[in-house]
Amino acid sequence: MINLIITLITNSLLSTIIIIIAFWLPQLYLYLEKSSPYECGFDPLGSARLPFSMKFFLVAITFLLFDLEIALLLPLPWAIQLPSPFTTLILSYCLIMLLTVGLAYEWIQKGLEWTE
């Protein structure tokens, strides 16, 4: 029991010391590049009302939606080991078909074209 208490106290002290050093150390060296905000290549000191491409925004949102839907397929190798792999196969097939139909719809509506 005493070994457990010593281990917990030692781990707590070490983690506290490391956290204090991590908060204290970066404040010693401030460079101009580190102290200026940087946001995706845009000048942070310029106007906040810059024109923004709506087409770029729509393509980015479309990418995020498809990316999140594909992330639903990641647990499939583990889901196949369930007692009813046929249900998993049907659900994954439906999800892939939904992705294919969504991509076809975006393609037909010219949502992935940059020029009009």
Swiss-Prot record:
Enzyme class: translocase
EC number: 7.1.1.2
The reaction(s) this protein catalyses: a ubiquinone + NADH + 5 H(+)(in) = a ubiquinol + NAD(+) + 4 H(+)(out)
Membrane topology: Multi-pass membrane protein
GO molecular function: NADH dehydrogenase (ubiquinone) activity
Transmembrane segments: 4-24, 56-76, 88-108
Major localization class: mitochondrion
Pfam families hit by this protein: Oxidored_q4 (PF00507)
Biological process annotations from GO: mitochondrial electron transport, NADH to ubiquinone
Keywords noted in UniProt: Electron transport, Membrane, Mitochondrion, Mitochondrion inner membrane, NAD, Respiratory chain, Translocase, Transmembrane, Transmembrane helix, Transport, Ubiquinone
Cellular localisation: Mitochondrion inner membrane
Gene Ontology CC: mitochondrial inner membrane; NADH dehydrogenase complex
PANTHER family: NADH-UBIQUINONE OXIDOREDUCTASE CHAIN 3 (PTHR11058:SF9)
Chain's role: Core subunit of the mitochondrial membrane respiratory chain NADH dehydrogenase (Complex I) which catalyzes electron transfer from NADH through the respiratory chain, using ubiquinone as an electron acceptor. Essential for the catalytic activity of complex I.
Quaternary assembly: Core subunit of respiratory chain NADH dehydrogenase (Complex I) which is composed of 45 different subunits. Interacts with TMEM186. Interacts with TMEM242.
Family of this protein: Belongs to the complex I subunit 3 family.
Name recorded for this polypeptide: NADH-ubiquinone oxidoreductase chain 3
Species the sequence originates in: Didelphis virginiana
Name of the gene this protein is made from: MT-ND3
